Amino acid sequence: MIYPKTYDVIVVGGGHAGTEAALAAARMGAQTLLLTHNIETLGQMSCNPSIGGIGKGHLVRELDALGGAMALATDKSGIQFRRLNASKGAAVRATRAQADRILYKAAIREMLENQENLDLFQQAVEDVTLDGERISGVITAMGVEFKARAVVLTAGTFLSGKIHIGLENYEGGRAGDPAAKSLGGRLRELKLPQGRLKTGTPPRIDGRTIDFSQLTEQPGDTPVPVMSVRGNAEMHPRQVSCWITHTNTQTHDIIRSGFDRSPMFTGKIEGVGPRYCPSIEDKINRFADKDSHQIFLEPEGLTTYEYYPNGISTSLPFDIQIALVRSMKGLENAHILRPGYAIEYDYFDPRNLKASLETKTIEGLFFAGQINGTTGYEEAAAQGLLAGANAVQYVRGQDPLLLRREQAYLGVLVDDLITKGVNEPYRMFTSRAEYRLQLREDNADMRLTEDGYKIGLVGEAQWRMFNEKREAVEREIQRLKTTWYTPQKLAEDEQIRVFGQKLSREANLHDLLRRPNLDYAALMTLEGAMPSENLSAEVIEQVEIQVKYQGYIDRQNEEIDSRRDIETLKLPDGIDYGKVKGLSAEVQQKLNQHKPETVGQASRISGVTPAAVALLMVHLKRGFKDAK
């Protein structure tokens, strides 16, 4: 049957990408349908029970700045919060939280069920329908056809998923869930370029069988950090500790003894695994000189004894899993509740996507999450929000939301995917960004909230909070610039106490705060330095960073401005690179293969040299007919 309602946007998949995509589209006022094979698993944390970290936490803050759900759900479910790299530069500071799986899933479902313009329906999708080269809807397992003007596909690891434990394997999207075999086959029929990737998960351990007296405790931070600008510490559930143990030479010998039955080493697994989150057998093989690896025991929630041993993801046979777990200190009597496993799945070459995450070959079809070759909840969620928003913009005939590399880590992520592609699961790091001093956790709202508000992603309450913060920062910076001190105004001992030396000339608070050995709190101990208004910790942090890093930020802005023409100059559809004088055959081939949308994207394709970019610029600026 054909369902009687036609939707603006259909989202397929209820994981982190799918839920953010559906919420984004519905927030923008589009009639949206979220299809999932099981409503009970909406927003499920399939692997580790944590959100954030270096690079990933930056993405979560960017999601939040655009009205996304992940940060707020984490505040409602987080059972341990830590600020990583707190003693380092502002660019690499990041927030990480352990989340209660049940509370996180409940928070996401509550948001979905209370979101206007959003319908939920429980059915696996087996086919997509086309009107020529344009998407027109989807067909579910029981034959219901849903019509839509745009479709966002967020299938995660479910497309032709295969689970491996030792030499045994079976079809599945994750443990306990079926694979999307029919949909995977249908997408292959559409000639979308695809490949296979792999990820994995560790065995879960019953906390009642862990000897915590032999482990090192890792408590959370005090005061407890907050993830969302809409959240607060009062939202947080009870806070608990993580624990640390280590592998040893016995553990490594046990792991090596299972190599002959490992699907990774016997060729059973075709997909490439994540370089920066390798399985324990891969670690032991690649780093044979290391006698020990640190393992974090992370609680899965407040109402369960289950622990997640972060660092021993494995697809080794179950007897090896038992032995390797029990070889570690504190786990000698550990009972495994669920075995570890590897899963390989289809992904589609993201170089076939536009910067909006719409496919280049099928109009109105958007991809987000692991289907694009990424790994991680945060990477998936960020893509989901962008794809959902751009699906609405497509339906409305409006320009897509495109984020630049110097504007957001999400901009870096998408640009990397569509220009370089992937040959292993892509994970976000701060080192991937050229302008990471601009892309801090603390200023995600300053970078993105206004853009989100303009297209309807950000609600009025969040917009009001943002403006109050932005105005408070501007007022305080201006006050610092107009509050002056002279050597004569301050007692000599007061100067030495605050500045570490005597003032040599008149200075304002703004210039004094730029000194590397002086922070805002110390400066405010000067007589007459305190502001009349009560400033939040977030405003003070923003003021201090903006003042101290102003010189570096100004230099980066000059560099960004110098590249602006290259980054934004559009390459015409159907441009004939053979008519660009001086381009080598290799560069022509790469440009024809990748079909970049801008000169900036072209410049980041492997093999496209600066000289080739210069030739492109000359060609476009001359205004040849084929480039108009």
Curated annotation (Swiss-Prot):
SMART domains: GIDA_assoc_3. NAD(+) binds at residues 273-287. GO terms for biological process: tRNA methylation; tRNA wobble uridine modification. Gene3D superfamilies: FAD/NAD(P)-binding domain, GidA associated domain, C-terminal subdomain, tRNA uridine 5-carboxymethylaminomethyl modification enzyme MnmG/GidA. It is found in: Cytoplasm. FAD binds at residues 13-18. It comes from the Bacteria. One of its GO terms (molecular function) is flavin adenine dinucleotide binding. PROSITE patterns: GIDA_1, GIDA_2. Keywords: Cytoplasm, FAD, Flavoprotein, NAD, tRNA processing. InterPro entries: FAD/NAD-bd_sf, GIDA_C_N, MnmG, MnmG-rel, MnmG-rel_CS, MnmG_C, MnmG_C_subdom, MnmG_C_subdom_sf. GO terms for cellular component: cytosol. Its cofactor is FAD. The keyword Disulfide bond does not apply. Transmembrane segments: none annotated. Belongs to the MnmG family. NAD-binding protein involved in the addition of a carboxymethylaminomethyl (cmnm) group at the wobble position (U34) of certain tRNAs, forming tRNA-cmnm(5)s(2)U34. Homodimer. Heterotetramer of two MnmE and two MnmG subunits. This is tRNA uridine 5-carboxymethylaminomethyl modification enzyme MnmG. It comes from Neisseria meningitidis serogroup A / serotype 4A (strain DSM 15465 / Z2491).
